[in-house]
Amino acid sequence: MAKKVSAYIKLQVGAGKANPSPPVGPALGQHGVNIMEFCKAFNAQTQEMEAGLPVPVVITVYNDRSFTFITKTPPAAVLLRKAAGIQKGSGEPNTKKVGTVTREQLEEIAKTKEPDLNAADLDAAVRSIAGTARSMGLDVEGL
């Protein structure tokens, strides 16, 4: 018989940087999950990614306190900030532009995000990422 799910926990944790301190420890502790076991498994799974890059993770906790987790791709905004070389987006995206991204950079980000985007093809994914870039105050070249 299948195990019964008791909770889903959604977190954003830096790649390779999971540790028992907040936010990871309290979120898992209240569901009775072995925190160190999760931290070791998560860090092992994300070790090939750039250290510290925020990675969304969905943890499924079962009644017997066992768990499974699925890592997603880093948020588009983080990848766009890295591509544009900026610290944060614009507070007034329509009036103050803070950087520029090219179509090639957007395609690279779209290929990275492809598993998590529900776009029909690469072009639709690029347009979606371009919309995120515009809302952050980035100029989009070549689109």
Curated annotation (Swiss-Prot):
Instruction: Report the coiled-coil segments.
Output: none
Q: Which GO terms describe its biological process?
A: translation
PANTHER family noted in UniProt: 60S RIBOSOMAL PROTEIN L12, LARGE RIBOSOMAL SUBUNIT PROTEIN UL11M
GO MF annotation, one: large ribosomal subunit rRNA binding
Post-translational modification comment from the UniProt entry:
One or more lysine residues are methylated.
Q: Which organism is it from?
A: Alkalilimnicola ehrlichii (strain ATCC BAA-1101 / DSM 17681 / MLHE-1)
Q: What is this protein called?
A: Large ribosomal subunit protein uL11
List the keywords (alphabetical): Methylation, Ribonucleoprotein, Ribosomal protein, RNA-binding, rRNA-binding
Q: Which family is this protein grouped under?
A: Belongs to the universal ribosomal protein uL11 family.
Described purpose of this protein according to its UniProt entry: Forms part of the ribosomal stalk which helps the ribosome interact with GTP-bound translation factors.
